[in-house]
Amino acid sequence: CALPIWKQLTTEYSVLTAMNGIEALAVLDNHYVNLVVSDVMMPQMDGFELCKTIKSDLSYSHIPVVLLTAKTNIQSKIEGLELGADAYIEKPFSVEYLLANISSLIHNREKLRQTFAKSPFVAANTMALTKADEEFIWKLNDIIQANLHNPEFSMEDMADALKMSRSSFYRKIKGVLDLSPNEYLRLERLKQAAQLLKEGKSRVNEICYTVGFNSPSYFSKCFLKQFGVLPKDFIG
């Protein structure tokens, strides 16, 4: 007897299970999840409704969704993709094929994140794969830009400004960018510094304080670690 699909996925991943879409949303509320694999046919809340809820709710909209279905008609496939499914796999399929899809989605997201983190002029909204995520990043960046000069500006201030709980805010930033809120704030300070250095109108020490660092030496150390070059040697 073949093992259930979720059991076969445990060879590669830590797997959490749910019997239907309602249970799945409860799991997402209580755990940090990288990806959802869902059957379309489920009681209470089916896979289409689950996918729609995930992709339209800011708490989960960054999570990739793979839908599995016995429906082979093209209309069902179109419906799944229109609801935001990242992959749509028809039964029967091999677990190897499912694993390849999961791996591809996770690794492509990881490549995007690395490019964003290491490239001074790549904006955070390139990481947004849904409308909800894009709006979230725009709002967050407006708040950060308005407070960039303030070295005391913190994760708590960001969460309060967005009217989110600390835990929801942390999980959202981590899910979209794979950074903690404080890491992201520091990265945005450094990206703004790179922009100012590119414009060439201010000295390094002035830029350091403009973007909210207290210490020029610490600023230079962070800049070097992030972008592989010292601020004084940086040419945009």
Language model regions located:
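Short, small-residue-biased leader/transition segments that mark boundaries at the very start
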Residues: 1-3
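Acidic, metal-coordinating helix/loop segments flanking the phosphotransfer/catalytic sites
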Residues: 17-35
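Receiver (REC) domain active-site loop signature in two-component systems and cognate sites
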Residues: 42
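The C-terminal output helix
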Residues: 103-119
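Terminal helix-turn-helix DNA-binding modules in bacterial transcription factors
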Residues: 175-214, 236
